Structures are given as structure tokens and as C-alpha cells.
Amino acid sequence: AELQSKSSPRSVEHLRRHDQLTLEKSEKLGMTQSSVQFGTQLRCHSFESRNDVTIRLWREEIAEKYEPSMRTRDVLVLLPCSAKKPYRLSKSHSRFRKSIGNRRVHEVMITSPLGLVPRELEDIWPAAHYDIPVTGDWDKDELSIIRQMLSRLVERVGYSSIVNHSGVETGLDGINEIDTRKGESAGSKDSLARLKDAVSSSFENESEELDFSPREEKLKSISRFKLGSDKW
């Protein structure tokens, strides 16, 4: 539909109206797609993809309702996305996680068109299934969406500090933020060293919790996101 719509302004108008009506109906009836066949892709190859109902609902849920684990609400680590999904299977994220080395941080990926993807939700639809051309550049609309979502998330959760390894300027005020990129690539030796140091310094006066199961907290987070509760 997106491919055909670009043939005329009227077609684009119809598609946008369709997406808006579908969004309103989905929110009213609670009809959202939560599971898809393995290998299904959500192709986001045009500007109009940003208005897709699935994408808009994700952005709204993350910004306004999503709640991370109580164990990881202190330090927020912002990371770039990767072409490979889920992100943790990529070589770049393997290096990021090795440098971070602390399970109490809250890892959130910055991406388009979803805006933000918390690490514990990277396996679910649509985070694990979207496909978008990667250029490394952000347009004003993408940055606006990301910053608005991030502002709401930080405000609601109440992180004490942010370790920013994403390369995106957050524009946030009133919170301690450490830029670990300094204009370098996310995977450079110096950037990774700064990432490791920033995380370590954030917890230098605290001891590691021993009764913390990341897997259990991940499942609880997915349950809260999908079902509104983690009380099993």
C-alpha cells in the first residue's frame, strides 16, 4: 500500500487517513497484534511507515505506559540499534554488553521508526521484526520523535543518570548525562573504554545484588508491557 500510495498526493492522503482511523479503532477496541509468524518482517522503507498503526502504538506505549524493572531504574544506558534483530545477536551489541558488564543498568536502543526499544523488549513484535534502510543519519522528524519519547520516559521513571553511547544528542536538562562517544564510532576502542568507565563509575559506591535474575525480570517486563501486570 505504501509503495502504491506514493504515485499521487491523493493516495498518500488516503493512506494517512486510513492509518489514523485504524489507530483510533485499535485503541478503542484494544486490538493490537502481539504475535506473528517466525521470520515475518515489518518493512519500514518510506516516510509513511512512521504513521503505521503498529509503530505509533509502540511509540505511545513506550513513552507513556512502559515500566522497566525496579532493579534497573537508576542508570539509563542509550545504545545505537543494529541491522540484526534481536540486537543482542549482533557483533556490535555483543561488544557493548561486554563493556557495560553490569546487569543493573537499563539498556535502551535508539532507532527509527520505533524511537526507543528497551533491551528486555527486543524479542517481541515489532521490535524484533522491523526492517529499515540504515544510513547513520537522522532527519528532524526522527530526532523529534526520539527526544519526545526519551523525555517522557526519563520523567516517568526517574533515572539518576544517563550514559549516552547512542551518538544522538538527547536535549535533556536537569539530569547527569555522560557522552561516551565524543564524536567517535560506537565500536571504537576508546568509545567502548569510555562506556565501561562511565557504567563502572555510576555504581562505584554500590555492591552487586546477588538475588537478581535478569531472565525473570525480562519476563516480568514483557508481561507488564503486554498484559499490564507481572502478577502471575
Predicted regions and their residues:
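Residues that form generic nucleotide/phosphate-binding pockets
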Residues: L3-K6, E61, S99, L153, ...
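Extended interaction regions within the primary functional domain
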Residues: S7-S8, L57-K65, T111-L114, I124, ...
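Alpha-helix boundary/N-cap detector
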Residues: S46-V53, D141-I145, D190
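Conserved mixed alpha/beta catalytic, RNA-binding, or beta-rich assembly cores of soluble enzyme
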Residues: I55-W58, E67-Q148, K220, K231-W232
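Glycine/proline-rich loop-helix segments at beta-alpha junctions forming the active-site rim
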Residues: L143-W232
